[in-house]
Amino acid sequence: MPAAEIPKNEQQRLEALNDLGILYIPLEDRFDRITRTICRLFDVPIAYVSLIDSDTQWIKSIQGLDLIDCPRNTSICAHTLLVDEFIACENLTLDERFKDSLFVTEGLKLRFYVGFALKSHGQNIGTLCMVDTKPHTFNDDDLEAMRDIASW
């Protein structure tokens, strides 16, 4: 999978991220309620909150997987930094952007991904995501529910 492009506003994005002062703090309990709710509401095994700096995707809360970070250049979520609101892939093997990702072809063999951009000062600083190893549908009701959760 090709790495996501660097956003044109990368410097401002990184400044907004650093202004939060939580990037290098380990997993955070305050986000766990959100990720647990997503797993239950959408019947997915994995949900997480992440922040993405210049090189690394840092996991701030995760359900269903033991992961604290991954390189930005292998991250599906890094692509979400480039959109205004969200990316939804009902089957990652059918999406040209992601079908060759190591997260799709090896290891977890993910099939479903929904990632919402998390914003600070108008900048995309991270993601609220849910994933599964099997395809799912993602309809308008799901979109509205996830939009509500992501705008906390």
Regions found by a protein language model. Give the residues of each.
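Intrinsically disordered, low-complexity terminal regulatory regions
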Residues: 1-73
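Generic recognition of well-ordered alpha-helical segments
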Residues: 33-36, 75, 82, 148-151
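Short coil/loop residues immediately preceding or within conserved phosphate-binding loops
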Residues: 44, 113, 125
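Regulatory sensory and allosteric helical modules in signal-transduction proteins
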Residues: 45-46, 52-62, 67-111
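Sensory-domain boundary capping and coupling elements
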Residues: 77, 118-132
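A short, aliphatic-rich beta-strand micro-motif
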Residues: 111-119
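A generic structural motif
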Residues: 134-136
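Amphipathic alpha-helical "output/dimerization" segments
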Residues: 138-152
